Amino acid sequence: MKKAVLIAAMFCGVVSLSSCCRIVDCCFEDPCAPSSCNPCEVIRKKERSCGGNACGSYVPSCSNPCGSTECNSQSPQVKGCTSPDGRCKQ
């Protein structure tokens, strides 16, 4: 019985952690994230259940997240920048 509870707890921890990590993707990787996207506030609201989209309705925009036609390769937000062919870099 204890083993089953331990396995369930580990599984839930991994699942909730992966969901909570989306906050980083939404709020920190995209330099055009709106000021209303406050990860601390989101964590407070979703503290008990981080399932689903932890950033609410905010979706990072891949149209031109760097604010120019080219990406700054030194930028910490380079992950969200668009490539020359217009697709979003992963």
Swiss-Prot record:
Matching InterPro entries: Cys-rich_OMP3_Chlamydia
Positions of S-diacylglycerol cysteine lipidation: 20
The organism's place on the tree of life at top rank: Bacteria
Subcellular location: Cell outer membrane
Signal peptide: 1-19
Record keywords, A-Z: Cell outer membrane, Cell shape, Disulfide bond, Lipoprotein, Membrane, Palmitate, Signal
GO CC annotation terms, alphabetical: cell outer membrane
GO biological process: regulation of cell shape
GO molecular function, one term: extracellular matrix structural constituent
Region (Disordered): 69-90
Outcome of mutating residue 20 to S: In strain: IOL-207
Lipid tethering residues (N-palmitoyl cysteine): 20
Its membrane topology: Lipid-anchor
Assembly and binders: Part of a disulfide cross-linked outer membrane complex (COMC) composed of the major outer membrane porin (MOMP), the small cysteine-rich protein (OmcA) and the large cysteine-rich periplasmic protein (OmcB).
Record function comment: In elementary bodies (EBs, the infectious stage, which is able to survive outside the host cell) provides the structural integrity of the outer envelope through disulfide cross-links with the large cysteine-rich periplasmic protein and the major outer membrane porin. It has been described in publications as the Sarkosyl-insoluble COMC (Chlamydia outer membrane complex), and serves as the functional equivalent of peptidoglycan.
Name of the protein in question: Small cysteine-rich outer membrane protein OmcA
Natural source organism: Chlamydia pneumoniae (Chlamydophila pneumoniae)
Organism placement in taxonomy: Bacteria, Pseudomonadati, Chlamydiota, Chlamydiia, Chlamydiales
Name of the gene: omcA
